[in-house]
Amino acid sequence: MTGQLIVLRGNSGSGKSSIAVELRRVLGGQVVWIEQDYLRRIVFQESEEPEPVNARAIEQLATLALAHGRNAIVEGIMPVVRYGEMLRRLAAAHPGRVHCYYLDIPFEETARRHSTRDKSAAFTAEAMRDWYRERDLLPAPRETIVVQTSTLDETVARILADLSRVA
């Protein structure tokens, strides 16, 4: 049995990690959470490389998890210019179901949310503005857009409903 691939993309402060944490809480051991920022900054100590090594690691970890019947959450900013091809390949190679979500949150809201996080001391809202990419959507696979008005609970419920829907 193969797991389901869940891709959560969006700008810093858009709520990706909060969604991943809640999905993992609800789904328990069925989920492998692959966090792009952790692999990029901590494991590989990369800045924004044109062909990041962490992208290959994300692809390999997700493929391994899915092949062993686990659901894989691939979560991160993952700009299309650096990660789009890897995400397209990952989705195309997966024989099971693929669910991609883009959190389309305005910069002002991401900056406000950032000010409430523990990691707000690690970088400023001004730095976030440099990274912000408006509607950086994948050409393929198609992403479901999650808008600012969707609460954490509503977004998680929507994803859980998508996961339980019969293909």
Where are these predicted regions, by residue range?
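Conserved phosphate-donor/acceptor-positioning beta-strand/loop module used by diverse small-molecule
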Residues: 94-113
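P-loop (Walker A) phosphate-binding loop of NTP-binding proteins
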Residues: 11
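ATP-binding Walker
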Residues: 14
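Walker A/P-loop
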Residues: 17
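Hydrophobic anchor at the beta1->P-loop junction of P-loop NTPases
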Residues: 8
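Glycine-rich phosphate-binding loop used to anchor ATP phosphates in small-molecule kinases
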Residues: 53-95
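Small-molecule kinase domains that catalyze NTP-dependent phosphoryl transfer to phosphate-bearing small molecules
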Residues: 116-160, 166
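Conserved substrate/cofactor phosphate-moiety recognition/catalytic segment
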Residues: 21-67
